[in-house]
Design a protein with these regions (language model features):
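Structured, hydrophobic secondary-structure cores that serve as assembly/anchoring elements
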Residues: 1-102, 108-114, 130-132, 140-144, ...
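A broad structural signal for short, well-ordered beta-strand segments within beta-sheet-rich domains
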Residues: 9, 134, 176-180, 189, ...
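Short, surface-exposed polybasic-aromatic patches that bind anionic ligands, especially phosphate groups
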Residues: 42, 54, 175, 180-183, ...
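Extended, Lys/Arg-rich, non-catalytic nucleic-acid recognition/anchoring regions
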Residues: 105-172
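Long, low-complexity, polar/charged, intrinsically disordered or flexibly structured peripheral segments
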Residues: 186-210
């Protein structure tokens, strides 16, 4: 501090050494897990429907995740993570090529970008480039005509230090194949792969069938995601698999699970839900919804879809518009893409709402359309029986943990306690002003205590 030798009042500006205030801690990010015909097996961030289809392809034999992601983006979702679960023994498709030496040896192997029988639909042509000292690689999918060309790479060499080294270029740019240099002993042009036309990759396998149990056991793949998640395993209703998802959410403490409905009637749904864990980290919705069939080019064709993806989108859009403390339910939560939904009687609605394992209704409301009309978790006993209460607690815990990361390895003294108190007080005041905490004044809404009482050492 400057020492002043003259009388007067002096003001000095000091930047408060607080960590930056948090914006959203990404409570509105979804996670989807299930069987998909093709695509990355690592958990992958997706920001649009077009990005999803570019990586995982169009509709195929297993469309549950496709439909969930489509409905997520159709209902205001912004970012999701996708985990493609594959069966045991799944393998990539392959094709090897010889070099051009007098005694030919294997010089190059192509594999499908990821496992599954889908890779057996890939074929590759290798042509001499115009320079005569390099090759062009043309990738086809689903046929051998020019309309089946999906990628083309030109002027590729087999020199590991070359700018157009075939392996580096293809592995950096292709969404269909990966390349492996097999280390042929030849050099120069002789090391290039021989020319070939429409050589199919073979031996790709989906492995064993992906079951609900497989998906439940695979959920720990989301450990690489450090954001809070709205988790949905499209179509998974098996009690053991659901228990695995819910246990994962509880153990992490920052995941909330949306459980899709069974295909049966209300009684079947209530019976199934009664076998799920008692937990505030999950909610069940019923019934399924009818949407336009995106796989059909015929007008008017519909299909029955799981609502979990749409609801995850509604969770996300409600978070953005109102805050995580607002229930993702009510007449404003219209399920985009839903054309119709089965009617529920008053008696059925009463039983769904009063059950120990509550089931949230999806209903048609005149003037509003098809909306979510329930916000209960699978925990009937306490205040966190409501979805927004549990999700608010998830948000606050994650936000306050992030805000206080700076304190690790700092001296545990009064200076640190003041910083923590100031950081959390400011954050909670902002959350209170937004409507996230009850009370007409901050003192009625929250208190922060970090002092010698709870830091005795």
């Amino acid at each position: 501090m400057t020492a002043y030798l003259r009388p007067g009042v002096f003001v000095e500006e000091t930047l408060n050494p607080l960590p930056p205030a948090l914006g959203s801690n990404a409570t509105s990010i979804a996670g989807f897990i299930g069987a998909i015909d093709r695509g990355p097996v690592d958990v992958t961030a997706i920001n649009s429907w077009s990005q999803f289809t570019s990586l995982y392809g169009g509709y195929g034999t297993s469309n549950l995740v496709h439909l969930a992601v489509l409905l997520f983006f159709s209902n205001g979702g912004g970012t999701c993570y996708v985990r493609r679960t594959v069966g045991s023994g799944a393998s990539t498709s392959t094709r090897s090529f010889n070099d051009r030496a007098e005694a030919p040896a294997s010089t190059l192997r192509f594999t499908s970008a990821n496992p599954g029988v889908w890779g057996n639909n890939i074929n590759v042509s290798i042509q001499n480039s115009l320079s005569g000292t390099a090759v062009d690689v043309i990738v086809y999918y689903g046929g051998t005509s020019s309309t089946n060309i999906v990628e083309k790479f030109t002027d590729l060499t087999m020199g590991g230090n070359d700018e157009r080294y075939l392996v580096s270029v293809i592995n950096a740019q292709s969404k269909y194949i990966a390349a492996v240099d097999l280390g042929s002993g030849a050099s120069g042009v002789s090391r290039l792969p021989v020319t070939a036309t429409n050589q199919y990759l073979t031996s790709g396998s989906d492995g064993s069938a992906v079951t609900a149990s497989t998906i439940g056991n695979d959920v720990t793949a989301f450990d690489v995601v450090h954001n809070s998640l709205i988790l949905n395993a499209p179509g998974v209703t098996d009690s053991t698999a659901v228990a695995a998802l819910v246990n994962y959410a509880e153990n992490r403490g920052d995941v909330f699970v949306i459980i899709d409905p069974v295909s049966g009637n209300v009684a079947a749904q209530l019976t199934t839900a009664s076998g799920y864990p008692v937990s505030s980290y999950a909610a069940v919705y019923y019934p399924k919804i009818v949407i336009k069939d995106p796989t059909s080019t015929v007008a008017g064709v519909t299909l029955t879809a799981n609502p979990g993806g749409a609801l995850a989108g509604i969770y996300a859009s409600t978070d953005a518009a109102r805050g995580v403390f607002k229930a993702p339910a009510g007449i404003t939560t219209r399920l985009g893409g839903a054309i119709s939904v089965a009617s529920l009687t008053n008696s059925e609605l009463d039983s769904m709402n009063s059950a120990a394992a509550a089931v949230n209704a999806i209903r048609y409301i005149t003037g509003s359309g098809i909306v979510a009309m329930g916000a209960r978790t699978l925990n009937p006993a306490y205040i966190d029986k409501y979805v927004p209460v549990r999700r608010t607690l998830i948000y606050l815990r994650k936000a306050m943990t992030d805000l206080t990361q700076f304190a690790i390895f700092e001296p545990n003294d009064e200076k640190l306690w003041r910083r923590i108190n100031a950081s959390l007080d400011g954050f909670l005041r902002d959350f209170w002003r937004q409507g996230g905490l009850r009370g007409t004044a901050p003192a009625q809404a929250f208190f922060v205590k970090c002092d010698a009482d709870n830091n005795p050492q």
